[in-house]
Amino acid sequence: MAALRRALIILAHSEKTSFNYAMKEAAVEALQRKGWEVAVSDLYAMKFDPIISRKDITGALKDPENFQYPAESALAYKESRLSPDIVTEQKKVEEADLLIFQFPLQWFGVPAILKGWFERVFTGGFAYTYAAMYDKGPFQNKKAVLSITTGGSESMYSLKGIHGDMNIILWPIQSGTLHFCGFQVLEPQLTYGIGHTPPDVRTEILAGWKKRLENIWDETPLYFAPSSLFDLNFQAGFLLKKEIEDEQKNNKYGLSVGHHLGKPIPTDNQIKARK
């Protein structure tokens, strides 16, 4: 019998009548049907505080006269002095094999409440260290997927669309947040123009999401340039190794959205996994 898998769904939408809430409900149903244990962090329902502050640390601060949140929160994590709400969320993350982030795209990024969740929960020492980041990060054995709704149509987020390439929009979240902490990032579930989508199509989208979730653990993650391609020290500047740079000179495309090397970006690098 396969080992029990655990999923954590982080929902960032205020309304239970929203399509985002319906996507969350569909995910819970589909995963539980396949034997997953599912936890949900409904950030609005929880009244989650997205603002980083001194209140996140219990006990004496290391340097109260020159408060620096990253250093103080990392030390507080190490010494078990983080506030209870942060500890609760970190425990959920620790226990999960798969994280699903369900949210509407707002101003080309995550909603403020979810941004605050990342800033408060993904503390130094817990979610990253500079000695262990990206594919060597603390969460390298976990998987994550973004399930996003947009107001604009798919064409608006295309290469010729007025909003620009969706791959560019996804890079800071998928690489700069999730993969930076080690997650294997799966193809995003993108639901475009949901406000203009008729009920029958919405039903089809929910059914397709449920179907995908049946085997989501077996999916191939998105490609990111491995950390082994870089000189990982401050003296070298964490730059691409010279021999790798030389190897890439004759390639038509760059390595990824962020590591394009001045060349065309690989098609759908942040939307489709390499086959």
Swiss-Prot record:
GO terms for cellular component: cytosol. Signal peptide: none annotated. It is found in: Cytoplasm, Cytosol. Its main location: cytoplasm. Pfam families: Flavodoxin_2. It comes from the Eukaryota. There is a cross-link at residue 252 (Glycyl lysine isopeptide (Lys-Gly) (interchain with G-Cter in SUMO2)). One of its GO terms (molecular function) is NADH:ubiquinone reductase (non-electrogenic) activity. Substrate binds at residues 127-129. It catalyses: a quinone + NADH + H(+) = a quinol + NAD(+); a quinone + NADPH + H(+) = a quinol + NADP(+); ubiquinone-10 + NADH + H(+) = ubiquinol-10 + NAD(+); menadione + NADH + H(+) = menadiol + NAD(+). The keyword Secreted does not apply. It is an enzyme of class 1 (oxidoreductase). Flavin-containing quinone reductase that catalyzes two-electron reduction of quinones to hydroquinones using either NADH or NADPH as electron donors. In a ping-pong kinetic mechanism, the electrons are sequentially transferred from NAD(P)H to flavin cofactor and then from reduced flavin to the quinone, bypassing the formation of semiquinone and reactive oxygen species. Regulates cellular redox state primarily through quinone detoxification. Reduces components of plasma membrane redox system such as coenzyme Q and vitamin quinones, producing antioxidant hydroquinone forms. Homodimer. Interacts with PDLIM4 isoform 2; this interaction stabilizes PDLIM4 isoform 2 in response to oxidative stress and protects it from ubiquitin-independent degradation by the core 20S proteasome. Interacts with TP73 (via SAM domain); this interaction is NADH-dependent, stabilizes TP73 in response to oxidative stress and protects it from ubiquitin-independent degradation by the 20S proteasome. Interacts with TP53; this interaction is NADH-dependent, stabilizes TP53 in response to oxidative stress and protects it from ubiquitin-independent degradation by the 20S proteasome. Belongs to the NAD(P)H dehydrogenase (quinone) family. This is NAD(P)H dehydrogenase [quinone] 1. It comes from Cavia porcellus (Guinea pig).
